[in-house]
């Protein structure tokens, strides 16, 4: 007899800006991993997919943060930052302007370098990691996926170090600036551009230097404050 238990899926709460920190958040990195997603050649209807990464092993760098609890905010709260290979074709299959592709890649690099820089000087930080692997945005999709995998592994190594069981990031507190998503204003996320910073290692006795830029807000659409 086959017995089936219903899987209980809990909705994870999002980070909540802390008024005591000027609406910044304080959190730690909870997990860093690379997910490899096999992209099917056929879509849901059995039609050959026109997406440029169809048939590829598509790497996704996942950095999961957990908010530090306070008396006013005692619940488990998470924020997940992901970095993916940049698409070079639009939905019509037309090439995206080269300048735009380069800007998006540099934006992702800037975000990852900024996060990794917060761990410089800590025990285990790989000072001999060398240069970040390059990306040829004009290469075939499968080659690009391999290059992105090396690119993401480089940054994972900067955050984790050589000892996966005792990662550099473990229990390192960070000030974090999460803002309403620029396009939808429906969720909080890191800003696309580093500017004066969106993450900063907490140093006892020092106030954060991160500030909100003009146009950045924590207020979400249909509501004045993040839910829960």
Give the location of each predicted region.
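Short beta-rich binding modules
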Residues: 1-228
